Amino acid sequence: MKGLLLILASLVAIATGQDCPAYYVRSSSGASCYRYFNIRVLHRMASEFCEMVTPCGNGPSRMGALASISSPIENHEVYRMVASFSQDNQMENEAWLGWNTQSPRFWEDGTPAYPNGFAGFHQSGSYTSWPSWRPGMPTSGWPVNPANPWTPPPGRAPVMKGQHVTPQQPGQRPNLGPEWDLVEATAMRAFVCEVAAGQNIPPGQQPGFGGQQPGFGGRQPGFGGQQPGFGQQPGFGGRQPGFGGRQPGFGGQQPGFGGQQPGFGGQQPGFGGQQPGFGGQQPGFGGQQPGFGGQQPGFGGGPQRPGMGGQPNSPNPRFNRPRMLQEAETDVTGS
């Protein structure tokens, strides 16, 4: 049973954005919200359940409690709410109220029990019913027990129950309303929870200012609808960090200057769009392979292999002779 109460409490404690939790009824005074639970439990379990209910909106931070009755209007409102759950609009089950003989001077929500409480009891202190107040009757007729708290047997708690008074004259409507009684706290009864009402929050306005997320003006935290910072992404002017909508650095380029890769101009690191070095060539000078003059490393204008003016040095003297003699010998040999 206690597990069931915990589940119910988790459901009713969800705020709805209104002034009362879900399925609670606001009192005519606007100060409280009530809900009747037609679950028969011990007084202690009913009290613990109500204490898990939280108020909605910006209501007081105190938790809920079993209902405390402090006026004839409130007494009748709670009764009508409970009676509305029956087919004949009369209470079918007695319901626990938020007081017990363990702390007789106060209701369980901390409000004084005297002089505004116990109005449903007869002033004689016999704990029997007292004819209830009805709408239109003067509130001054609400009996108040001016004495110190009674000293009934310990372990008792009040219940609200239906009352039917037979008309005194033919044609007079019966007096239907609540009366209270003291019963053993170990008895099983239904109960009524009360929680302070919060201020009604207009739809779509979350806590903060002007319907926006916490911050100013409907924007994300910061200023002016932007991401944190000023007007844009962090930094200045709607851009990425840095200046002017560009990547970090200056002028929309990659880090460095201009639109180029790091360095100067549009080239790779170095100068003039070429590979590292000068003039668009491979490392070296003049577009040639390393060395001078477009040739293989070495000197001369030919595409020969490394060496000086001929084939690479070879142990065969034939290959070290001038090309003209080599070609002549080739012609003679071939012929």
Swiss-Prot record:
Function: Major matrix protein of the sea urchin embryo spicule which directs crystal growth in certain orientations and inhibit growth in others.
Compositionally biased region (Gly residues): 207-310
Organism expressing this protein natively: Lytechinus pictus (Painted sea urchin)
Protein name: 34 kDa spicule matrix protein
Main location: secreted
InterPro entries linked: C-type_lectin-like, C-type_lectin-like/link_sf, CTDL_fold, SM50_spicule_matrix
One GO CC annotation: extracellular region
Segments traversing the membrane: none
UniProt keyword terms in alphabetical order: Disulfide bond, Repeat, Secreted, Signal
Domain comment in the entry: The repetitive domain may provide a calcite binding matrix.
Residue spans of biased composition, Low complexity class: 311-323
